[in-house]
């Protein structure tokens, strides 16, 4: 599933093409993704200029004068920029095309767990949309620090890894990045969130930012379907310290990496480096 780094890589790849350009038309070939595609989307966007492309958590927000169209990549979704002169014939899983003068922005999603939604300007600020309003803080924002993690986890018995994944404290720390961040911070993923000290949470906040920044620099992680807007795979997974390395020696101390299951998700950690 594309997480924050993959979505940010997509945003950075798309924004230079679409910002300041007008949508000539929208071809919607699939009316139902995770939720119904708004029936009037094509008409709403025709001849509209894209003013900006932002990201909130794992959602992409495309602003036009009348509102925002919101895209979520789901588990297998991608957005590709294709030159107008050489656009391949739409395949089975190519659900929506936004057609500009010199290129096409194509949404592909084999499993159809992604979403394309509309939020009108009359409905208010897009960040108040029901899917966005309850999200945690952005990991690169000044609001995210060890004090926030410490304060929001007091009294919580859930594991620190599951607290990171929940998304109500901080957004975008998916399964890969939670395991990697906890390794960098030296925290065992099974530790109760409410028992982690403030100094350790300060290290974890820095580790989360560093891990996500490294992943963005490497084009994200490609485990199955993800490619960036240019069709290239990410390669962060090749440099992971612990993720998907069960039984292999720790890159720091040589201890075999362990794999456990937490909340039906695989967790990887070093029993020596992480306490």
Swiss-Prot record:
InterPro entries named among the record's database cross-references: DNA_glyclase/AP_lyase_DNA-bd, DNA_glyclase_Znf_dom_DNA_BS, Formamido-pyr_DNA_Glyclase, FPG_cat, MutM-like_N-ter, Ribosomal_uS13-like_H2TH, Znf_DNA_glyclase/AP_lyase, Znf_FPG/IleRS
Biological process annotations from GO: base-excision repair
Matches recorded under PROSITE patterns: FPG_CAT, ZF_FPG_1, ZF_FPG_2
Cofactor(s), names only, from the UniProt record: Zn(2+)
Cofactor: record remark: Binds 1 zinc ion per subunit.
Binding of DNA, residues: 93, 111, 156
Disulfides per UniProt: none
Gene3D superfamilies linked to this entry: 1.10.8.50, MutM-like, N-terminal
Active site feature: 2-3, 58, 265
Alphabetically ordered keywords of this record: DNA damage, DNA repair, DNA-binding, Glycosidase, Hydrolase, Lyase, Metal-binding, Multifunctional enzyme, Zinc, Zinc-finger
Keyword Nucleotidyltransferase: no
The organism's place on the tree of life at top rank: Bacteria
CDD domains documented for this protein: EcFpg-like_N
Reaction catalysis annotation: Hydrolysis of DNA containing ring-opened 7-methylguanine residues, releasing 2,6-diamino-4-hydroxy-5-(N-methyl)formamidopyrimidine; 2'-deoxyribonucleotide-(2'-deoxyribose 5'-phosphate)-2'-deoxyribonucleotide-DNA = a 3'-end 2'-deoxyribonucleotide-(2,3-dehydro-2,3-deoxyribose 5'-phosphate)-DNA + a 5'-end 5'-phospho-2'-deoxyribonucleoside-DNA + H(+)
Subunit field text: Monomer.
Family stated for the protein in its record: Belongs to the FPG family.
Record-given protein name: Formamidopyrimidine-DNA glycosylase
């Amino acid at each position: 599933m594309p997480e924050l780094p993959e979505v940010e890589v997509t945003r950075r790849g798309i924004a230079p093409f679409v910002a300041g350009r007008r949508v000539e038309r929208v071809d919607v070939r699939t009316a139902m993704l995770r939720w119904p595609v708004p029936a009037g989307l094509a008409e709403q966007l025709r001849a509209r200029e894209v003013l900006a492309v932002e990201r909130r958590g794992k959602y992409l927000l495309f602003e036009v004068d009348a509102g925002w169209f919101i895209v979520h990549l789901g588990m297998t979704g991608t957005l590709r920029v294709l030159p107008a002169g050489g656009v391949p014939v739409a395949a089975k899983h190519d659900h929506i095309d936004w057609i500009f003068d010199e290129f096409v922005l194509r949404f592909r999603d084999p499993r159809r767990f992604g979403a394309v939604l509309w939020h009108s300007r009359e409905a208010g600020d897009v960040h108040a949309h029901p899917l966005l309003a309850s999200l945690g803080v952005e990991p690169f924002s000044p609001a995210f620090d060890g004090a926030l993690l410490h304060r929001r986890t007091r009294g919580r018995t859930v594991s620190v890894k599951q607290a990171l994944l929940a998304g109500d404290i901080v957004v975008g720390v998916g399964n890969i990045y939670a395991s990697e961040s906890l390794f960098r911070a030296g925290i065992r993923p099974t530790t109760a969130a409410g028992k982690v000290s403030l100094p350790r949470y300060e290290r974890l906040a820095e580790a989360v930012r560093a891990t996500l920044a490294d992943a963005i620099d490497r084009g994200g992680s490609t485990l199955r379907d993800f490619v960036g807007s240019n069709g290239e795979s990410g390669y962060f997974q090749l440099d992971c310290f612990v993720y998907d390395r069960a039984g292999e020696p720790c890159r720091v101390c040589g201890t075999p990496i362990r794999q456990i299951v937490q909340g039906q998700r695989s967790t990887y950690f070093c029993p020596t480096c992480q306490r």
